[in-house]
Amino acid sequence: MTISRQFTGLTLAGLFLGLSLSAQAFSPSVQTGADIRRTGFGVPHIRAENERGLGFGIGYAYAQDNLCLLANEIVTVNGERSRYFGPEQLTVEERENRISDVFFQWLNTPQAVNAFWQAQPAEVRDLVEGYAAGYNRYLAERRQQGLPQQCQGEWVRDIAAEDLVKLTRRLLVEGGVGQFAEALASATPPQAMANIENNARAYQLADTRLQRFALDRGSNAVAVGSERSFNGRGMLLANPHFPWVGGMRFYQMHLTIPGKLDVMGAALPGLPMINIGFNQHLAWTHTVDSSKHFTLYRLQLDPKDPTRYLLDGQSLPLSKQTVTVQVKQTDGQVVPVSRDVYSSQFGPIVQWPGKLDWNNQFAYSLRDANLDNDRVLKQWYAMNRAGNLKDLQDSVHTIQGIPWVNTLAVDDKGQTLYMNLSVVPNVSTDKLARCSDPRAGLKMIVLDGSNSACAWDIDPHAAQKGIYASSQLPQLLRKDFVQHSNDSAWLANPAQPLTGFSPLISQDGQPLGLRSRFALDRLATLSKKGLVSVQDLQHMVMDDQVFLATQVVPDLLKFCTSQSEAALKSVCSSLKAWDGRANLESGVGLVHFQSIMQAMQESPQAWRVAFDPKDAQHTPRGLAIEKPEVAKALREAMLASAEIAAKMGLTEKTRWGDVQVVSSGGQQTPIHGGPGTLGIYNAIQSVPREDGKLEVVSGTSYLQVVTFDDKGPHAQGLLAFSLSSDPASKYSRDQTEAFSKKQWSVLPFTEQQIKADPQYQVQTVRDDLEKTGKVAAQ
């Protein structure tokens, strides 16, 4: 399938918008294809002679396992959900269809998609076009058999390369304007404020989702070097925390082009390359960073017209883009509904009642640095092919395509690398002091939109206008260790703090998250005992220690000794019996601990030892139970927890595995782990169900521990939610059950390992109209 500019001779738009929708516009005489070799848990090892064939194999294999998931995401990123499912149904991300459609119609215009495509190198185009063709081949075959029950509508269709570009652009803005879809789609000039009131439900959902964003997209990573590893080689733990459903659900695979590419790991839907993984000489992972990837601009509006703004004293009109969404009515008819999206020269207007109001005096524009990032696919493919750590580092320095994550890596020589080299707006500390609204603080950067001097600075050495050059961003190369769990770059290794950066890049002197404190504490303990082993890294995740419990449980139990109320005694008894972990067999004390500490952590006065930037690894800690106000708050939190447990139907005999589960195909699997906010490294987010249980929605996803010897990599891993999202697939629960039992799997990488796997089978798929692949037992 190709995307190309078309001359129609009739309209200027044709020059820019002509996108071929044919998914197989290639010479029929050229036959490409791939071998899809599956091993344990169905993991595909895809081998082809070139990128087109490799992409074909990836798309085919992915469709075998996740046909309906990708079909659904394609509808979403094309802004067509209201057309097929009605305007008020919620997406997987709990966003109303009508809001989602307006946002994606605005984001993925033909001009934007075509510009992205034109920037791609030939190898990336071949991968993407091959992926679309492979997906379509399997879809055609599956139609003959009958489509899965969950995707038997007209919305399931062949895809094209531009659909995959739209998926990629959605990924890019996850850390920016993607969090403000409601605010963008509903922004209305002051005369029409009634429309805002009608969107109260949408904003409530958006507010909840925004608060949960960091929890759903976190990660842990530890890279151990030659000075600390058991064999003097590099060793990497990758533990990304991502959604278990939808368009951010990882897929496990191994990609090979003989003599050019050999890489294994996991990728997000629609991406024909590995995001997190390893090859012959190195392993890498990502953690969601704390850097800013967008800024807001507060516009000073023209007193005569709220659709005009003042810039350097000159009145300028807001541009207006009319977005038309096809909407299915209750009678089944589909009618067009139009919506205007307003923008200043800084970006789209976003309106959030009570937070970002558009009135007669001010409005807010959002500028997302990743909207101009067309380098992300090129970046990951270069990382996939890196022959050593320097190659990987150089590619990230040069391409600057990493959108909103840190990179941690190791090599077979024993080096470790940390890079906070993502796409960050170039706003210096001095400019921030001159241009930002101090009332907004540093959580959300708000710059002065009436002064052109407050625009992002331009560094000629950066890969993109308005972002920091890679040489100005934090990075660390060491031989002992680097680690990260979604804090700033500051203490990736406490022996060499990274300081002095713009607050948009990294803030030092701030409290560490509890997962970071756990990791630093565990690594210090391991260092005292000796060298770090593979099992040590596995245990960091799988022993499910609740780090916060080590800091406060003694105070909780001391408080309990003075309590006599029956409800409090029950809570205290559970806390005393609890093992301080989030294992399946851990007691109901974990539920009480979570409820109590969620309430207590909201008060800085609750800590007995306050945060000290000179001792960030060990503070804050302890509960100041001797303070009357803290004792009162603690008592109230315990009573509230007793009520919650009663409503959930929990007793002192309840175990954590009875409470937290994941459902698939009518079956439930108990899941260990818990909230990362409690310092549980194996971070799992779950939401209440009507039956009193908690349903897992995100958290530990793809797990890998990789080390090396003279022959290459040795890896163990798991995909916690399993390979397939189809409940009918035999690969939909198998790895989930293994994860529940804490059973790691050896990841076969060499040809000998792959073919020796007891579950080995191979399917050859050809990219032509005549032949289809057949499964052959080997």
Curated annotation (Swiss-Prot):
The keyword Hydrolase applies. It is found in: Periplasm. CDD domains: Ntn_CA (cd01936). GO terms for cellular component: periplasmic space. It catalyses: an N-acyl-L-homoserine lactone + H2O = L-homoserine lactone + a carboxylate. Residues 1-25 form the signal peptide. This is Acyl-homoserine lactone acylase PvdQ. It comes from Pseudomonas fluorescens (strain Pf0-1). The lineage of its organism: Bacteria, Pseudomonadati, Pseudomonadota, Gammaproteobacteria, Pseudomonadales. The gene is pvdQ.
